[in-house]
Swiss-Prot record:
One of its GO terms (molecular function) is NADH:ubiquinone reductase (non-electrogenic) activity. It comes from the Bacteria. NDH-1 is composed of 14 different subunits. Subunits NuoA, H, J, K, L, M, N constitute the membrane sector of the complex. Keywords: Cell inner membrane, Cell membrane, Membrane, NAD, Quinone, Translocase, Transmembrane, Transmembrane helix, Transport, Ubiquinone. It is an enzyme of class 7 (translocase). GO terms for cellular component: plasma membrane. It is a multi-pass membrane protein. This is NADH-quinone oxidoreductase subunit N. Belongs to the complex I subunit 2 family. Its main location: membrane. The chain crosses the membrane at residues 16-36, 45-65, 79-99, 111-131, 133-153, 168-188, 212-232, 257-276, 281-298, 306-326, 333-353, 378-398, 413-435, 457-477.
Length: 487
């Protein structure tokens, strides 16, 4: 590694990682508060976490328009990192809002939940800001280890325990690929700095250097697992179904965005000279991921498994924009990840409300009659389903438009057509939920419990985030385009 300890301390600028510092300190403080201030209700921890998340958000946005590095150029604060940090903080905030009601109902509202969410967010933010392979790995491991705990957080649920174990075993396996790839790249180039790797790629032979090529593909394998791209998606349905629903919501949005953030910075900064090699691989994986995700989702009755396969398909849409290598496609990924955070977590918030203790109401059929019994809740779910399907005038439509436009600009017209066809196929299973809500009578009377204020706030924010960017996309697109220019 290119790190000299004396130089490292001279280059430390805590303002660059102030959001991470805020959440880290708060997370450790909440762990202590949870131990020394016992309380049956953990709601106060949720609100303290939200305050910290908002504070971290303010600390992040104040750096917009600047590019400052720290820790001997291991991390950077730029528009790209800030954009993704906002996505992570939104995902964390929404997950916290929908967690207390669910965890209290399931009698697993342990106080450690909220600090672990904060630590996961710190790991994701490090991945977006990292400009060194080892910093990327540090952020990824902090995120992953925290996610393993969140997946198995309901200790009384066999499915939750199984989800945590599966995620841990397969995640550790994928991390091995990632780390071995980094080792090969370091062995070939002699550096772990992303920018320096770019300047050395041509010197060491580029794609003609077998070790460099293998190292790049091994790293990609690790990231593709994190974003749940086929054929590295097999863990997703079981983990999403077994994990506590608020944690599934968080896992489906934040880590996926973190994986794309690290991939974008790594491939576009370190390996632009090898774009022909990784672009060909990505469009193949994009087609496979979209198709596997959508056509498997068509057969699902369990709504969490349906959204799990849907999540795989959405990773495929983003890979379309990635494979294009264009500014339009890349900014489309940023826009889409932000929109996806709102619409997907919003859908899971509705699942939290419809479910009962033990989650027996996990099928699409259980939503029959919801439009008559809880019209506002059904309306919110309709917005989320339309946005996930990419129907105008939602944010999902605009996001897919820019992803596929990037492919067309790069000459991948056929790839854009495949993307549109896959998106059309997905309409079936999203509309199926809406049909059951409005046109199928409920077979039994459910004792719908009240919607608490935090969950209601999460639903309102998610619905607004799913609609407003679709109606007025220019502002967010402008921010996304500014973020992409700096990588």
């Amino acid at each position: 590694m290119d790190i000299n300890v004396a130089q490292l301390f001279q280059t430390i600028n805590l303002n660059v990682i102030m959001p991470e510092v805020i959440l880290s300190v708060l997370g450790m403080a909440l762990l202590l508060v949870n131990v020394f201030v016992p309380s049956k209700s953990k709601g106060y921890l949720a609100w303290l976490s939200l305050i910290g998340i908002v504070g971290a958000g303010f600390a992040a946005v104040t750096g917009w328009g600047t590019t400052v590095s720290s820790f001997s150029d291991s991390v950077v604060l730029d528009n790209f990192a800030i954009f993704f940090k906002i996505i992570f903080l939104l995902a964390a905030g929404l997950a916290v809002l929908i967690s207390d009601q669910y965890m209290s109902r399931e009698e697993c509202n342990h106080g450690e939940l909220y600090p672990i969410i904060l630590f996961t967010t710190v790991g994701m933010m490090l991945m977006a800001a990292a400009t060194d392979l080892m910093t990327i790995f540090l952020g990824l491991e902090l995120m992953s280890i925290s996610l393993y705990v969140l997946a198995g957080f309901n200790r009384d649920s066999i499915k939750s325990n199984e989800a945590g174990m599966k995620y841990f075993l397969l995640g550790a396996f994928s991390t091995g690929f990632l780390l071995y790839g980094m080792a090969l790249i370091y062995g070939v180039t002699g550096t772990t700095r992303v920018a320096k790797i770019a300047s050395l790629v041509t010197q060491v032979g580029g794609a003609s250097n077998t070790m460099l090529l293998i190292g790049m593909f091994l790293m990609l394998t690790g990231f593709l697992f994190k974003i749940a791209a086929a054929p590295f998606h097999m863990w997703t349905p079981d983990v999403y179904e077994g994990a506590p629903t608020p944690m599934t919501a968080f896992m489906s949005a934040g880590p996926k965005a973190a994986g794309f953030a690290a991939m974008l910075r790594l491939l576009l900064v370190a390996f632009p000279a090898m774009i022909a090699d990784w672009s060909d691989l990505l469009w193949i994986l994009a087609v496979l991921t979209m198709t596997v995700g959508n056509f498997t989702a068509l057969r699902q009755d369990n709504i969490k498994r349906m959204l799990a396969y849907s999540s795989i398909a959405h990773a495929g849409y983003c890979l379309v924009g990635f494979a294009s290598g264009t500014a339009t496609g890349t900014s489309g990924i940023l826009f889409y990840m932000l929109s996806y955070t709102f619409m997907n977590i919003g859908a899971f918030a509705v699942i939290v409300l419809v479910g009962k203790k033990g989650e027996p109401n996990g099928t699409v059929m259980d939503y029959a009659g919801l439009g008559h019994k809880r019209p506002l809740l059904a309306l919110a779910m309709t917005v989320f389903m339309f946005s996930l399907a990419g129907m105008p005038p939602t944010a999902g439509f605009i996001g897919k438009f820019y992803l596929f436009s990037g492919a067309v600009q790069a000459g991948y017209i056929w790839l854009a057509i495949i993307g549109v066809l896959n998106s059309a196929a997905s309409v079936y299973y999203y509309l199926r939920v809406i049909v059951y809500m409005y046109f199928k009578p409920g077979e039994e009377e459910f004792d719908w419990f009240n919607v608490t204020a935090p969950v209601a706030l999460a639903l309102v924010v998610s619905a607004a985030g799913s609609l407003i960017p679709g109606i007025i996309p220019s502002m967010i697109l402008q921010f996304a385009q500014q973020a992409v220019k700096l990588i």
